[in-house]
């Protein structure tokens, strides 16, 4: 629920009410049941949960794994999204200009869908509506954290809310305010960053032919190009485009109009879905692998892009963050049941230990694919050609890759 003035103390303060922060709060609220816990969410941007406007053509989209669907179902959010998502029944992976195409389908994996694509605006509406309806979660918005300091109790936050300045103590602060977190910078938490010298161009596109719930991942000399299935709107066959470009290409393409950009995209993607008829508003941003050197401190935990920001090649960023979210909620509920302080370091280290392997494996998996499929080095060209053939011939290997993509891998 929205509040105009915060209390002086909260058991938990979440900085950032976006997809990760809001999902964490919704999951925690459900897990708490009748257990009392004071929660404050600080969000810089005013929510628009009650807007009657539907998701526009230009809304960006997110790929959700099958595992993320199960998580959102478990916290009662999937039901509100179900009519706004497009299921992925098959994934086709190919290397542009070379033989070898791998098809991974839902029947082979024995699941209803390999994943889903949801438009960010709709996901935001559902999450914001839940926060506003909650009787346990206090939402201060728009508000900014102006200062942060460790105390014996946990953390002391200075807040700017409209024309008002105030402060709040918290046993635990969960940072979920994105990859360029000003709070992280204030605390001196460093990031390990590897820049890929690539940019992603993201847009929604209109296609001549229906996608038939197939997602396409096409590897090119400048990096991967993905087209994910979206729901029909006004009878238009739509897809979500993630196009990896060199720095030079990104500088050129971001200034191009639709007429100039369409033939370039068509040449790169091909005609599997016929002609590309329209490109919506484009978003261009640099790509890197960024990992926080500290994910926890006494009274502090990091979630989402502030903890780890991945290349979008495998669509693992939000899905990993939701697995982190589930783990942190479990650890905090367990601590509450044992009457331990939420911000105690031994509690937070349980969370780190639980997610360390998943985070390391997922980030390395994404990084390796990025390096392998963005290179024209002959050895890597041969290796990825061999890899695609191996995936085509070996169902067990294909199943392992699919399980990782679906967020169901145990390793």
Predicted regions mapped to residue ranges:
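Conserved N-terminal helical subregion
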Residues: 8, 84-186, 194-199
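Conserved Rossmann-like nucleotide-cofactor binding loop
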Residues: 20, 47, 180
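N-terminal FAD cofactor-binding segment of flavoenzymes
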Residues: 54-96
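FAD/FMN-dependent oxidoreductases across multiple families
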Residues: 251-338, 342-343
């Amino acid at each position: 629920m929205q509040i105009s003035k915060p209390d002086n103390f909260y058991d938990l303060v979440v900085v950032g009410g976006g997809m990760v922060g809001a999902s964490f709060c919704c999951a925690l609220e459900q897990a708490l049941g009748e257990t009392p816990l004071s929660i404050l969410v600080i969000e810089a941007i005013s929510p628009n949960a009650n807007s009657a406007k539907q998701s526009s053509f230009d809304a960006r989209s997110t790929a959700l794994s099958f595992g993320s669907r199960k998580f959102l179902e478990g916290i009662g959010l999937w039901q509100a999204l179900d009519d706004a998502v497009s299921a992925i029944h098959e994934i086709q992976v190919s290397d542009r200009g070379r033989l070898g195409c791998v098809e991974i389908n839902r029947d082979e994996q024995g699941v209803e869908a390999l994943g889903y694509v949801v438009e960010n605006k709709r996901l935001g509406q559902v999450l914001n509506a839940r926060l506003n309806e909650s009787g346990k979660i206090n939402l201060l918005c728009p508000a900014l954290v102006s200062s942060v300091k460790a105390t014996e109790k946990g953390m002391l936050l200075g807040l700017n809310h409209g024309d008002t300045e105030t402060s709040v103590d918290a046993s635990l602060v969960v940072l979920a305010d994105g990859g360029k977190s000003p709070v992280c910078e204030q605390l001196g938490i460093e990031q390990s960053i590897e820049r890929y010298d690539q940019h992603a161009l993201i847009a929604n596109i209109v296609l001549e032919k229906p996608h038939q719930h197939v997602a396409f991942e096409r590897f090119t000399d400048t990096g991967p190009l993905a087209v994910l299935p979206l729901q029909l709107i006004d009878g238009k066959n739509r897809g979500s485009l993630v196009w990896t470009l060199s720095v030079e290409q990104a500088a050129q393409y971001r200034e191009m109009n639709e007429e100039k950009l369409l033939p370039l995209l068509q040449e790169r993607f091909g005609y599997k879905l016929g002609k590309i008829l329209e490109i919506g508003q484009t978003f261009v941003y640099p790509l890197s692998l960024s990992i926080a050197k500290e994910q926890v401190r006494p009274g502090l935990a990091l979630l989402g892009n502030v903890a780890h920001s991945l290349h979008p090649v495998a669509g693992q960023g939000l899905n990993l963050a939701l697995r982190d979210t589930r783990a942190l909620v479990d650890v905090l509920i367990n601590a509450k049941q044992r009457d331990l302080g939420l911000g105690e370091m031994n509690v937070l280290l349980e969370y780190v230990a639980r997610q360390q392997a998943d985070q390391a494996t997922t980030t390395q998996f994404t990084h390796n694919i990025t390096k392998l499929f963005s290179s024209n080095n002959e050895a890597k060209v041969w290796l990825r050609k061999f890899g695609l053939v191996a995936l085509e011939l070996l169902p067990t290997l294909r199943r392992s890759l699919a399980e990782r993509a679906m967020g169901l891998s145990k390793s």
